[in-house]
Each structure stands twice: as C-alpha cells, then as structure tokens.
C-alpha cells in the first residue's frame, strides 16, 4: 500500500526524499523511514477517530485446555495494558487477541504459588486486579457463541429488531460481539464488575456504554431498555441494594428482578441462569418475577453446555420473560414446582413442556451431595437442539404487536413506551378513565397517550390518524 502511494521510487539506502499521501495531501519526507513513521501516525489517528467494533465469527471462541486458556488470558492482559499505556484503541488484529480472554472461572490452580505460571500472572496484575481475578474462579463462566446465537434467534422470533439493549453482567462482551447484523442499530449498554474484563470490553466495543462497577451500584431509570440479555452470575449469596434488600434475593434472582424493572413494559429479558431459579422449592423470587413479567418460555441446557469454553459442568436454563404493565390477577403455574415420573422436583413449566429439556434429567452425586442434572444425548449437537427449542417457544412477533409503528418505535427517542400486548390500543369507544396505562386512543380527532400516572397527553405518533378518524 505504501509503495502504491509514492510519487517517486525510494532508494534502497532510504536517503532519497519520498512523497506519500497524508490526510489526503501529497507530503514529501526526507527518507522512507520518516514517511513510514508519518503514515503509521496517520493510521493511529484514524483509529482513534473511528475505532473498530469487534464481531465474533469463531464458534469455538474460548475453547481449549486450561493451559491454553491461561496463556491466552495472559496475552490479552498484556495487550490491554500496552494499549492503555499508549492511550490508543485496539486494531482489528489486536481485538482478536483481546477476545480470547475468558476470565478465570474454573482456573483455581492458576492462583497456586506451586503453578509454574503463577509468577507471570502475579507480576502482570495489580494487587486489586489479582484479588478480583482470584475471587472470580467460582462464577466467571463466559457464554459460548452457540448459546448466544440461540438467544438472539429467539429475540428475533419475538419480533425484536433494534432498540436499547442492556447486558448487566457482560464479561468481555460476547453478547455484544454476537449481535446479529439485523440488530446492528441497537444502542448497547453493558455492566461488568471485573476491571480487566470491563476494560477489555471497552476496547472491543468502543461505541457501547460500558460501566465498570457492580450491577447493584448502577442507577438506570426504570422502563429505560427494550431488551436485557446475558448470563447472570449465580451463587448462594446476595448483593446489597437498598431497593431490593427486603426481598433477600440470591444474586441470580436479583439480576432478574432488577432487570425487569429496568426494561419497559412489553420488553424482553433473556438470561442464562442456574436451574435453581425455576426449580428451587421456595417460590418467592419467581413470584416477584411473575408480578413483573410473563414467562414466554424456558430452555433447559445440558450440563455440558459450558464445559468446552468455561470448564463448568452445570445445569442451566435460558429464561425468556416479557415485562407486564400491571401484575396478573393470579400467579401463573410456573411460579411453583412439582415432581416428574421419577420423583424429581421440577418447575411446572418443564413438567408441562418436557420438549424444552435438552437432555435427560437424572440424579447425580456432586462434591456438595445429591443433585439433579440435565444429561445430554451424545449423539445430538447442542446447536440443533437449541434451534428446535427456539421454534417451540413460539410467541412470534410479540414485540411488533406491542408497537404502534413497527419500524420506528425502537429507534424513537420519544418518552412514550410502546403499548403492551394487553393494552387498549386505538379503541376510541373505550372510556378514557378505563384505559390502562401506556394505552392509546383517539379523543376529539387527536391520538392520546395515557401515562403511568393516569394523565392523558397528546401522542407524538400521529401516523394512521386519518385512517382512524375515517
């Protein structure tokens, strides 16, 4: 490329003056070396003005032995610190290296002084970074592209195209990296507690709003996102958040309840979570979720779904919830559990929809005692099972049925949220005082919108008014 831009041939000794294009103008330099330095600086300036956004194309991202993952983690951290020292964005090639960072889940041995790589890791991280990395070995399990793709396929099936997407526990941002082309105009907001992971995510997705803090510290407005996706942390502990402390929620349940508050009525939350969210005997957390949302469906993943890239054998579920505008009159069946033919405790949803269990439920013995696990069929690929399960979810275009103008709602900056599925939309015969919040009606030839507090205001969305008034 450099040679094709020259106006005169440089001599082999580099002393011959040479001209190249810099900022769109031919500029002469005393030597090839000086021209190369100027060209490199121009490239770096262009990179700062328009840094690339990373797109995941490798379905095997993060796979490998513990040693391979450890080495790739170290390479990513070294590169991150080099980029930060130079105060510059990552190139597309450097993003490939950064994207291989998978955190330290399942790598407790890396933090043993007896490990031959221990000193490399210890010298590379600050004291705070080292403590955070060591603390993450139990729950920093990143999500494979196969699972993420299935979640986006389901969102598309529901009718989601573009909008404000929240990822409240993003790691290095695999959900952002797998964002389909058809959803590329979405506004992305991510939250990540771990400093290293969050800083890598910022280098991979420079156009996203990424907050490096605990989700409990965020102050997002309620009803401010169209969709929330992710793989939430799970464990037998709680976070301190004054608004939710009285509910005594375990961390994975907390992420659901808070995210449902942040998503608008009609919006969808799609999270990977522990099977305990649906199967545990205590229904309190599920009832809180049911007060806020309808369960569109759930997919139980085999306990090998995170084995290749996260090194974890754990049974997990993908839950798809659609935000309600008001609580239901009766709590749905999925807030409770029952027993299957083998006497195992399962959520009523899976008892009614066994086709959504991508394996066979069996009793197993773990280091913590007896448990149940979804054991896979070794002859069937997870990708094929997920594709079929997404189709079984149904609920086609529920997002579209909740919108007034299908092509514009998710790109609109209006403060009016789209009408929920059960709202009285465009029913001018309905008395105004009986309209539900977030509903639309025609009054005196004007399209009106009912806010959450009951006030009627003129709607900015006036298309179709002539049809409605005819």
Regions found by a protein language model. Give the residues of each.
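Charged, often flexible domain-edge or linker segments that flank or initiate folded functional domains
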Residues: 40-100, 398-399, 405-408, 413-470
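Conserved Class I SAM-dependent methyltransferase catalytic core
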Residues: 195, 246-307, 314, 318-321
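Short loop/edge segments at beta-strand edges and connector loops
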Residues: 211-214, 299-300
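Conserved proline-anchored active-site loop of SAM-dependent methyltransferases
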Residues: 149-158, 162-180, 190, 194, ...
